[in-house]
């Protein structure tokens, strides 16, 4: 990214952190957290300890980071190297991202940027100008991406509350600022769980590794009465609703499952996992030393804010997370796909000078689809 673009983004971000600091969620037990940040065109700075909101505000104003992070873990010495921090416990965090959902819409709003000649083309594997295969993919997520991610959030929330006895008031959902959601679970029975236990939790939520015997099927002499019933709790109930369809079809479907045999039943379980298992990023939840994007901070992939979703159904990602200025900026835009922010449509642009609001200019510059003119 060139110096002019960096200065433009830093100016917009600094104005945000000066005017909108109340949107930053300063985490509880602040002094026990590890903070980190990145600057534009620079690496990560980690192992920072912050005492309170004043220190955090000072850090933001002095450094004007592209991205700000905070640990889900609590440490005795958060500013020391990892093996000296003395890990106490960690909040449970889940990451749901549209890019992991295999959505059919993805190809329609994904662009390929050539790292050799900087040509921008619609989702391709080879540059149309110089034939290079060194391409960077950029997505401009659509409403379907967000709506599909919301469905996964709802599935996750139901499992947490119904199966795992998590109090719904201890679950907080945040839009990531780009194309997904971060789900935080506080004060739960899982606070002191290590990576291995969290891995087992992930498998349960995603319905990974389910074995036929747990659902009534045996290699030898299976008993039809052992198969799940429609009204059972947890995954047995979900299995029943998905596989049988209705109570009246249970007997017929069980007969078919018995007839098809053990190996076929395993494929049925795999199908259940693929279709109704919650699609979370397992590595995020298992990592008890990770630092996460700070709620209320700007996501440098978009210029949008990681924001708390008080009402997930009504939440409009590309309106409710856009807080940058409406002031007009002239950019040289090469964005061949239309996008929508704050209920306004922008693009497509083909190597042309256009005047757009700052929030739209930042969005395109962050995605390498425009430069300051």
From Swiss-Prot:
MF-aspect GO terms: DNA-directed RNA polymerase activity; metal ion binding
Enzyme class: transferase
InterPro entries: DNA_primase_S (IPR002755), DNA_primase_ssu_PriS (IPR023639)
Keyword Metal-binding: yes
Catalytic activity, EC: 2.7.7.-
Keywords: DNA replication, DNA-directed RNA polymerase, Magnesium, Manganese, Metal-binding, Nucleotidyltransferase, Primosome, Transcription, Transferase
Keyword Metal-binding found: yes
Xref: SUPFAM superfamilies: Prim-pol domain (SSF56747)
Recorded superkingdom: Archaea
GO BP annotations, alphabetical order: DNA replication, synthesis of primer
Pfam families linked to this entry: DNA_primase_S (PF01896)
Family membership noted in the UniProt record: Belongs to the eukaryotic-type primase small subunit family.
Subunit structure: Heterodimer of a small subunit (PriS) and a large subunit (PriL).
Biological function: Catalytic subunit of DNA primase, an RNA polymerase that catalyzes the synthesis of short RNA molecules used as primers for DNA polymerase during DNA replication. The small subunit contains the primase catalytic core and has DNA synthesis activity on its own. Binding to the large subunit stabilizes and modulates the activity, increasing the rate of DNA synthesis while decreasing the length of the DNA fragments, and conferring RNA synthesis capability. The DNA polymerase activity may enable DNA primase to also catalyze primer extension after primer synthesis. May also play a role in DNA repair.
Entry-linked HAMAP family: DNA_primase_sml_arc (MF_00700)
Protein name per Swiss-Prot or TrEMBL: DNA primase small subunit PriS
């Amino acid at each position: 990214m060139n110096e002019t673009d960096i200065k433009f983004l830093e100016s917009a971000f600094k104005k945000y952190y000066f005017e909108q600091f109340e949107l930053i969620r300063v985490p509880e037990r602040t002094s026990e957290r590890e903070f980190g940040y990145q600057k534009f065109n620079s690496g990560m700075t980690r192992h920072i300890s912050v005492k309170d909101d004043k220190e955090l505000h000072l850090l933001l104003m002095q450094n004007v980071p592209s991205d700000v992070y905070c640990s889900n873990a609590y440490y005795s010495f958060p500013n020391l190297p990892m093996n000296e921090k003395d890990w106490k416990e960690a909040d449970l965090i889940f990451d749901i991202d549209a890019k992991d959902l295999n959505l059919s819409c993805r190809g329609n709003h994904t662009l390929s940027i050539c790292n050799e000649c900087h040509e921008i083309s619609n989702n391709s594997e080879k540059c149309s100008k110089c034939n290079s295969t060194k391409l960077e993919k950029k997505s401009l997520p659509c409403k379907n991406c967000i709506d599909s991610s919301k469905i996964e959030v709802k599935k996750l929330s139901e499992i947490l509350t119904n199966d795992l006895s998590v109090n719904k008031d201890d679950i907080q959902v945040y839009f990531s600022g780009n194309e997904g959601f971060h789900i935080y679970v506080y004060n739960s029975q899982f606070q002191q769980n290590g990576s291995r236990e969290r891995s087992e939790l992930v498998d349960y939520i995603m319905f990974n590794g389910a074995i036929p015997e747990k659902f009534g099927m045996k290699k030898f002499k299976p008993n039809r009465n052992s198969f799940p019933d429609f009204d059972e709790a947890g995954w047995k109930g979900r299995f029943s609703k998905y596989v049988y369809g209705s109570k009246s079809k249970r007997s017929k479907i069980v007969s078919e499952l018995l007839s098809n045999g053990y190996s076929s039943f395993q494929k049925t379980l795999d199908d259940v996992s693929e279709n109704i298992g919650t699609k979370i990023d397992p590595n995020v939840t298992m990592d008890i030393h990770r630092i996460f994007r700070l709620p209320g901070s700007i996501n440098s992939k978009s210029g949008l804010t990681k924001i708390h979703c008080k009402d997930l159904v009504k939440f409009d990602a590309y309106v409710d997370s856009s807080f940058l200025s409406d002031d007009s900026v002239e950019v040289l835009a090469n964005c061949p796909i239309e996008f929508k922010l704050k209920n306004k449509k922008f693009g497509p642009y083909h190597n042309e000078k256009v005047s757009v609001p700052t929030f739209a200019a930042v969005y395109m510059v962050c995605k390498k689809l425009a430069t300051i003119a």
